[in-house]
């Protein structure tokens, strides 16, 4: 099964510098994310290139809007767009179209003028896009709650995003938002581990199905191999 994936992470501003360094690949080493292949960093590309640092981009937009900012205000939203690894591999040539379509969907919802960075990472196992925006309303208020909505609205976001992407790629399936799974939003590192575990569990379920007297030995070997692989995934 191939899933569309859309994740929002609300940020109050303190993480802007570290997120900037990660998304824009300004670090020399990436110990926290060993999946990054430094030899492929040049393959990354922007749909929106930041003019300044993330901190400056955020500060500039808020100042220009002249809006009120509280200590607990969400100053920007870090958005992740990706797709199941098997789909990305099978549709490698179509990945630019995938991210362009996702970008068009998001800019209509959050306001293109509020987006200060949209970068596609091709230097990891699965291509993905990080899109960051300041949640400014049309009447110049800082309100992530109004733009993203409540839990019910987040489910609608997933429905609409899936409909947009599946119109082009009908084989895709809808991702499940955290409000439905009861699972908190995951960091990229944890997400990769959970995805790997989910994939192994699906294969294990398949290996244990349709067991009969003729294939029992082979099925047992497949299950044992998958269980060993699961034990190596440290969550």
What are these regions (language model features)?
Residues 1-232:
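N-terminal nicking endonuclease/strand-transfer module with a His-rich metal-binding environment
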């Amino acid at each position: 099964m191939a899933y569309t994936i859309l994740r929002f992470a609300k940020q109050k501003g303190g993480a802007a510098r570290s997120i900037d360094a990660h998304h824009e690949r300004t670090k020399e080493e990436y110990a926290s994310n060993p999946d990054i292949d430094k030899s492929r960093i040049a393959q990354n590309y922007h749909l929106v290139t930041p003019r300044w640092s993330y901190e400056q981009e955020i500060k500039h937009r808020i100042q220009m809007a002249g809006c009120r900012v509280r200590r607990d205000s969400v100053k920007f939203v870090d958005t992740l767009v990706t797709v199941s690894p098997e789909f990305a591999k099978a549709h490698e040539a179509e990945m630019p179209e995938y991210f362009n379509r996702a970008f068009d969907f998001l800019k209509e919802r959050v306001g293109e003028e509020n987006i200060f960075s949209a970068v596609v990472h091709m230097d990891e196992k699965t291509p993905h896009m990080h899109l960051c925006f300041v949640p400014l309303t049309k009447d110049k208020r800082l309100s992530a709650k109004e733009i993203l909505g409540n839990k019910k609205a987040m489910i609608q976001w997933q429905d609409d995003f899936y409909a947009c992407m599946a119109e082009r790629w009908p084989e895709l399936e809808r991702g499940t938002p955290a409000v439905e799974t009861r699972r908190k939003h995951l960091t990229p590192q944890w997400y990769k581990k959970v995805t790997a575990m989910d994939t192994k569990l699906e294969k294990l379920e398949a290996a244990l199905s349709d067991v009969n007297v003729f294939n029992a030995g082979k099925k047992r070997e497949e299950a044992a191999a998958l269980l060993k692989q699961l034990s190596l995934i440290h969550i």
